[in-house]
């Protein structure tokens, strides 16, 4: 009995001490200066020029299961058709720091989202995405990514 109790205490101590020495999870902050544009000068900024469409993306957080992601994205002028049976492959929340976007859903309804406004595009949305350029904070979620883990 004594040995069993000692083993239980030793195991509990090992579990607790392991937990105490695990990496601390901390919040991820983006400063005002970064949101004003400095974030796009970071080494991890991904800059693209795809057929004249220029964009810069800085991912600020990705969950361990890859299902949830946040970041700051800057786009030049763009027209994009989001089509097909699957539509948008993930849900996305967008908050516009500058610029605007015109969203035309597949039923023809139109929504304009301006600087200081936000919109959520549900997974599966289809339509047209038109802009003269913008900078956004974004959050994406894709439950299918979590299922892959």
Predicted region positions:
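Short hydrophobic/aromatic-rich beta-strand segments that constitute the beta-sheet cores
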Residues: 82, 103, 136-139
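Conserved short histidine dyad/triad with adjacent acidic residue
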Residues: 69-88, 122-123
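Short acidic-glycine-tyrosine-enriched beta hairpin
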Residues: 107-123
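A short, N-terminal "cap"/entry segment at the start of jelly-roll beta-barrel domains
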Residues: 19-69
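Bacterial N-terminal signal peptides
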Residues: 8-15
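Short, conserved beta-strand element in jelly-roll/cupin
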Residues: 88-103
């Amino acid at each position: 009995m004594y040995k069993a109790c000692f083993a239980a205490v030793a195991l509990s101590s090992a579990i607790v001490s392991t937990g105490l020495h695990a990496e601390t999870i901390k919040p991820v902050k983006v400063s005002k200066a970064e949101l004003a544009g400095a974030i796009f000068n970071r080494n991890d900024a991904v800059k693209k020029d795809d057929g004249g469409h220029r964009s810069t993306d800085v991912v600020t957080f990705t969950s361990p299961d890859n299902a949830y992601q946040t970041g700051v994205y800057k786009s030049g002028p763009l027209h994009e058709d989001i089509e097909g049976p699957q539509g948008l492959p993930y849900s996305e929340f967008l908050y516009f720091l500058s610029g605007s976007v015109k969203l035309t859903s597949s039923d023809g309804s139109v929504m304009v989202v301006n600087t200081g406004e936000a919109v959520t595009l549900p997974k599966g949305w289809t339509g047209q995405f038109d802009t003269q350029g913008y900078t956004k904070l974004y959050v994406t979620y894709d439950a299918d990514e979590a299922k892959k883990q």
